Amino acid sequence: MKTVLAQGKTAARIALADAITPHSVGIGALAGLEGELTILDGVIHAARVTPNYALTSTKLTGSQTDDSATLLAICEVAEWETVLLGEVSSLSALETIVAAELIDRGFDMTRPVPFKVETTFSEISIHVLNNSCPIANPDGPEPWRGNFNTKNGHLVGLYAVGFGGELTHHGSDSHIHAIVLDGDVVNSSGHAESFALEPGSILYLPK
């Protein structure tokens, strides 16, 4: 992440068609920081900001896309186990829950672990990069930002302690993207900045 976001080295590094399988889950950024990538069960959600500052979010499999990523963190998970959640008040609260569940299951906490959540968001704020990173280029185009209330959706994340600047932002133990639905249709996707989850959300951890 440091190389891409802070140093501005945003060239294409990997073709998504070569990387994504039906069991892939992960997060990333499009080449040139043209947008955000969220991969859920082999489906690529690519969010981009249009010239008039609207958001488009496409939903494709690896074989259907010719997009490339400058930043991509994916894992292959064939089987998941589930945990029913109560109310989750914040992103940091979810981090605490995920950490406790991973420790309870004997995961190696020195290695990144993927997770996903099926949920109803009480509220959520996301952003999508707009051909620039405000860290490396504060005078560049502003990211698209969206706020939503009472929407169904998904979270896809990596829990990664000690990977600040590599897989997570400094000061965070996770890197989480969101897919926000409008009914059964994807409304938006992007990097999750903050959220609260209603009771009954389902946390998925690798089995």
Report the location of each language-model feature.
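Extracellular/luminal recognition modules and glycoprotein regions
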Residues: K2-P22, E76-W80, L91, T150-G162
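N-terminal low-complexity or amphipathic/hydrophobic leaders
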Residues: G8-T70
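Extracellular structured ligand-interaction cores
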Residues: E34, P112, D173-H175
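Contiguous hydrophobic, core-forming segments of folded domains
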Residues: R48-M109
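N-terminal nucleophile
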Residues: S57, Y159, N187
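Mid-length scaffold segments of soluble, non-membrane domains
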Residues: E87-W144
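Short, hydrophobic/π-rich interface segment
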Residues: N131-D182
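C-terminal structured interaction module
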Residues: I179-K207
